[in-house]
Amino acid sequence: MKLRILFIGNSHTYYNDMPALAAAELEKQGIRCEVTMIAHGGWFLEQHVQEPDVKFNIRYGHYDYVVLQEHAHPFGPEEKFYGAVRCLTEWIRQASARPVLYMTWAKKGEEGEQPRMSAAYREIARKTGALLAPVGELWWEYRRSHPKIEMYDGDGAHASAAGSA
């Protein structure tokens, strides 16, 4: 049996094909999986709520997990993020799947924004009971402990190949 995972987000989801990288990591652990992605550059989760294909895929895709990734640069406002997550997690649960929040990282030179982003993800995960993948926090920890590895792509926002690994 294959684990089915839907990723919903923007360029932080499709950059370096994050769903395929996640699938490869799961396969290394002996977990067979199939990933699907709905991602549009620059989109907020609020925009995905308005997209009929998103609700259709959640409802009829027979997914085990649905991973939600919010717009990161700029991040917020939190109220819109919270509203979109509440709506999406309701749809996900109605489809008998588990919601997962994929926390992103702050832009290069704006590390001070990470605590705000982290707090918002943690708060809505707690309120909705969604699983939290604290990628942004782990990303910064790795970056601090490995300063010679360039984690950012040239745009200073997206992950480089090393930052996605």
PLM feature spans:
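Conserved catalytic region of serine esterases and O-acyltransferases that act on ester linkages
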Residues: 165
